[in-house]
C-alpha cells in the first residue's frame, strides 16, 4: 500500500469517528493501522484499527470499516498454552454484517468480494447495529463487512496476536506493508 493511500484512509477514519462521536487523541489517530491484507484493494478487502491496549491478559480496539469493506475470513488459533483469542464485537456506529461458523443464512446480506468467493466459507449471519454485540469463541472462522454507511465496532478480547491469525485466502498478508512515497 502506498503512503498516500494510508494517509487518505486514516483521514477518512478520523472523520468516521468524529461523526460517530467517538473521541480519539491525536496520538491515536497517528497510529491508525490500515490493513489491505496484501490484496491491493483496500476499499473492498481491508480494515482500519485503533488499538487502545493489548497486554498478555486483554485487548481493546476500535475497528472501522468503510461502506461494504470486508475483513477477510480468518480464525484466531491456539498459541502456546492459550486457546486463541476470544473477542466481543460491539457495534458503535453504522451496521456490520458478521459471519461465523454455524447454520448458514438462506440469503446473506453482505456481498462476498468478487474473485474471492472460494475463500469465504462460513455464512451464519449476525447483523449488528449500534448497541448490539456478539462474542466469537476462540478458533472460530469469521469474516465481517461494513454496511452501506460503513461501521465502527469496538472489540474487547483476550490478548491479540494478529501475526498468528489464519486466513482462508493464502494470499492474505495480515501485517500491513506501507511504501511511503514522500
Curated annotation (Swiss-Prot):
Keywords: Carbohydrate metabolism, Isomerase, Manganese, Metal-binding. The keyword Manganese applies. GO terms for molecular function: D-lyxose ketol-isomerase activity; manganese ion binding. It is an enzyme of class 5 (isomerase). Optimum temperature is 70 degrees Celsius. Its EC number is 5.3.1.15. Mn(2+) binds at residues 74, 76, 87, 142. InterPro entries: D-lyxose_isomer (IPR010864), RmlC-like_jellyroll (IPR014710), RmlC_Cupin_sf (IPR011051). GO terms for biological process: carbohydrate metabolic process. The keyword Nucleotide-binding does not apply. It holds the Pfam family Lyx_isomer. It catalyses: D-lyxose = D-xylulose. Its cofactor is Mn(2+). Optimum pH is 6.5. Homodimer. Sugar isomerase that catalyzes the reversible isomerization of D-lyxose to D-xylulose. Shows weak activity with D-mannose and L-ribose. Belongs to the D-lyxose ketol-isomerase family. This is D-lyxose ketol-isomerase. It comes from Cohnella laeviribosi.
